[in-house]
Amino acid sequence: WVRWVGPHENLGDLTYRAEFSGYEPVDGVWLPMSFNVVSDFRDNVQLRLHVDRYVLDGDVGDLAAPPAVRAAPAPTPAYTVDASVVAPGVWLLSGNGGANSVLLEFADHLSLFEVPTNRAWTAALIAKARSTVPGKPVTEAIISHHHFDHTGGLRTAIAEGLTIVTQAGNVAWFEDLARRKVEAFPDALSRNPKPIKIRAVDDHLKLSDSKLTVDVYRVVSNNHMAHGLMAYVPEHHLLIQGDLFDVGWEVYFWGNTYDDNVAYRKLEVERDVPIHGRVLPIAEVHAKLKEQTRNAEQLCAKVESVNLSMPGCPLAWND
């Protein structure tokens, strides 16, 4: 076996162990016909490979990088963040570094909905929030759910002193992420350790002052995410969400979950403000959801026709 340590945006120092098996002679050399790579995070299998054939001493050409490339330092990601006004006190932060975040301006502080993708992108988002509304501190980050693409900047947010607003079911998990060892590949939090500050939401949290009101709700009736949150800005009829809908998806397996959440909370949504995608009027959201769901139905039918199964099939929804 071989063991090594690599960096992970969410998990910090991740130890991998590759185990080799099924050795067979190939041109006089005993070589493994399969190997399995497991990480030290819950013994998660990262890669399992079975070899079809080997080629020994084959011509692979010159694989060396040019001298100038070998001598150059590793590039620093150059991120550009755009702040688009959605409504007074609400901006969509988007750009070339990853998923969106949403900036919310209160009377004496700023909040972000989502710290996504990775640490560097989240640092750029926080910097953009501060420059968009100078003089007000960014004090909290509302996180839609625990998936890695939505929490890639969690450790950066903690290092910046932000309070993490999350559904109560995520608290232990986020505390675990904050405690992960990050020594081989240090980040902002390992260089400047701080305790995680969490504000847990059970079902509903109202954030309100003289400038802005935001209702944070637990997501119901959704089998994509556990312990999810969405936010509603009643004054401007905005729904802020991560993974309840994405205009870029081709299929949608979750039936009426979007409208179920809106109806359950008695919201009057006029525009959707997504973490993935672009701001859309609710009529376009409904039209796209219907198209995506019908595409999912067709996919399920194809899968069933060859006697296979797929998670999410058959669909249950009301047209």
Predicted regions mapped to residue ranges:
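Gly/Pro-enriched, hydrophobic low-complexity segments
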Residues: 1-65, 229-234, 241-242, 247-265
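Active-site environment of divalent metal-dependent phosphoester hydrolases
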Residues: 11-12, 43, 120, 146-152, ...
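Zn-dependent metallo-beta-lactamase
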Residues: 46-107, 205
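Conserved beta-strand hairpin/beta-sheet module of binuclear metal-dependent hydrolase folds
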Residues: 84-131, 228-246
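Active-site neighborhood of phospho(di)ester-bond hydrolases with catalytic His/Asp-centered motifs
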Residues: 113-115, 137-147, 165-168, 239-245, ...
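Active-site metal-binding motif and surrounding structural segment of the metallo-beta-lactamase
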Residues: 120-165, 200, 265-270
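Divalent-metal (often Zn2+) His-rich catalytic cores of metallo-beta-lactamase-fold enzymes
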Residues: 156, 259-318
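Metallo-beta-lactamase
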Residues: 160, 169-220, 265
